[in-house]
Structure formats: C-alpha cells, structure tokens
C-alpha cells in the first residue's frame, strides 16, 4: 500500500507537492518525513547518481524517480510490488510535467504546486489494491521492468550525507583554528619585536631627551 508521496526539486531540495493526507495514521510519520528531507538534501548535493532507486527503511521502502531535475518519491509497505510503485510514480511524473513543467524552475516557495494533491490522491486510489484487473495487468506488463533498479538501506544512503557533513564540519573547524593560530602567531611576533626593540627605543629616547634638555639649558 502507498503510504506517502512527495515531489521535490532536485537542485535545491525544495518540496513542490505532496499527498496532503499522507502519514496521518502512520506510526512515526515525522521520522519518515525527516528521512525524506535528508534524502532530498543528499540528492541536491548530487550524492546519488541513480535516476531510479529503492531505499529500505524499517517495514517500508522509499521508491523514487528523478527526471527533469524533479524527484518523485513514494513510501510503500515492503510487500507492495516494486513494479506498481514505479508505475505509480511514472503516472505522477507525466502529469506533473504536463501541468507544471514550465514553472518548476521558477518556483520560489515550498509546496508551490500543492493543488497537485488532487491528482496524487486520485492516482493513489487506483494503485492501492494490487488485486484489481488494472493493476494485475500492469504487473504482467513485460515491457516495464524494474529488476535493474538498485535497492539500498536508508542508513547506507543517509550515512554518505552524514559523513560529508562531518568532513565539512571538520574542515570548517580546522579553518577556524588555523585563523586563530595565525592571529596568535601575529601577536607573538609583535610582542617579540616589541621586546627586541623596546630597549633600543628607550635608549634613543633618553639620549634625545638629554640632548634636548642640554640645548635648552645652554
């Protein structure tokens, strides 16, 4: 059964549309939505090259399609046929491109195409029951194959992003520490110069003062 559906722009991870009633009766729905956001973040960084992938998470599987810089993602039960999940996404993709194609790149706010929820709900109902003649025919369609689509674990996929975040954080910390070290080095050099030349400056100052006083008296 289809549990959740989201559409986002790949270039920046901006959510464009979603099924509004998704996740209402789903335990830990917030956790899964956070995982989806993390997946979109990874995709915006170009960390997953596959245009089609399945990502296992607990008792569910995320399936997604990337096309035209847009990611179409759904979360289904593990028992739900992979073939139907991707055909469901194909239907969403075709309609979304037809209706919103020219405006996708210029969308500036989250869920700019929230009205697309109507089509999501209508299409989801068609795919919920895998035993209907329509869906059985789709499962038997030999022209649409999903065997080549990779399946990975969510921790494996998100772990890549976490490691890159750690590297980025470490790099920022090292840069900050290098700046602090450079500033301290400048201060130490300045203090060393003062200690080196201060006595000389004092001697010259005393000599100059004595010379000036002598001239005044004479």
Swiss-Prot record:
Subcellular location: Golgi apparatus membrane; Endoplasmic reticulum membrane
Principal location: Golgi
GO biological process: embryo sac development; endoplasmic reticulum organization; endoplasmic reticulum to Golgi vesicle-mediated transport; gametophyte development; Golgi organization; pollen development; protein transport; retrograde vesicle-mediated transport, Golgi to endoplasmic reticulum
v-SNARE coiled-coil homology domain mapped to chain residues: 135-195
Disulfide bonds: none
Presence of keyword Metal-binding: no
Pfam family, one: Synaptobrevin
Protein name (database record): 25.3 kDa vesicle transport protein SEC22-1
Species for this entry: Arabidopsis thaliana (Mouse-ear cress)
Gene: SEC221
């Amino acid at each position: 059964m289809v549990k959740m559906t989201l559409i986002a722009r790949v270039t920046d991870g901006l959510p464009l549309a979603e099924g509004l009633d998704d996740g209402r009766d789903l335990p830990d729905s917030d956790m899964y939505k956070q995982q989806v956001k993390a997946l979109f973040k990874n995709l915006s960084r170009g960390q997953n090259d596959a245009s089609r992938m399945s990502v296992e998470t607990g008792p569910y599987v995320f399936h997604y399609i990337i096309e035209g810089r847009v990611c179409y993602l759904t979360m289904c039960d593990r028992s739900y046929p992979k073939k139907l999940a991707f055909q469901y996404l194909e239907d969403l993709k075709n309609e979304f491109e037809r209706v919103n194609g020219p405006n996708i790149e210029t969308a500036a706010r989250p869920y700019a195409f929230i009205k697309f929820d109507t089509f999501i709900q209508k299409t989801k109902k068609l795919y919920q029951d895998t035993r209907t003649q329509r869906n059985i025919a789709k499962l038997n369609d030999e022209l649409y194959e999903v065997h080549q689509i990779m399946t990975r674990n969510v921790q494996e996929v998100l772990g890549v992003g976490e490691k890159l975040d750690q590297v980025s954080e470490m790099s920022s910390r090292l840069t900050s520490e290098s700046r602090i070290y450079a500033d301290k080095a400048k201060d130490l050099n300045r203090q060393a110069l003062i200690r080196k030349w201060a006595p000389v400056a004092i001697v010259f100052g005393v000599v100059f003062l004595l010379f000036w006083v002598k001239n005044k008296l004479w």
